Amino acid sequence: VLDSEKSGLNKSPITVISGQGKTIFEAARSMNKKTSKVFFLADIDYVFLDQSVLTDGLDEIMDFLVRDTRLSLNFLIITSTENKSIDILSSISHFDTNSANNLYDAIMNSETRYGGINSLHVRELINNYYEKGKDTIFPNVYIKDTTKSSENNSLEDSKSESNVEVKNMVFFKDKEVIELTDEETKGVNFLRNKIKNATLTIKCDGGYFTIETLESKMKLISKLDVDTIN
């Protein structure tokens, strides 16, 4: 929530509001006790899912996303294997004091200018979840300097000067967290035709050289050789 009365280097213009409840909807509505502003689900830019939520299962989350017709279903899904969502949202970037905007822009910029990261929209998460044999990889972010995060005990003020950065991509298999390297993520993105712009560094005599891929199209053909089946 933007607070116009806060200004200066020591005060964040962002107030982080949290809520609790037995259900997702109850938790969301409970935040109205802490602010006069009205929250609209259609305004969501991204949903941050803690690692504990992803390892325990997505059944309740998916039920809420599919049933609620007020959601735009165009927002991003993000996670972190190192930090809690409240700490991520309470961190101020040197580039943008609005931590929500900074995190969204960092994901999109990494996807379109680097290639080692790709965004995950909620529609893709829903489709992958209900398709057998298909795992979902999530953008993984972290707080670069954790010693400066959450300087106060109150969740209501965002005062940390830590910088949130995009780390890598992860997926969850049988409650196990598997992190992909930049090269592994780029390989997956090439196979899935999700490369929009990527840099590839190749070793050569006397050093390395980097090439930029502006467009890529991959076609997979599977073949079953019955003669090799025992």
What does each of the following model-derived ranges do?
Residues 1-230:
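Membrane-proximal alpha-helical signals and transmembrane carboxylates
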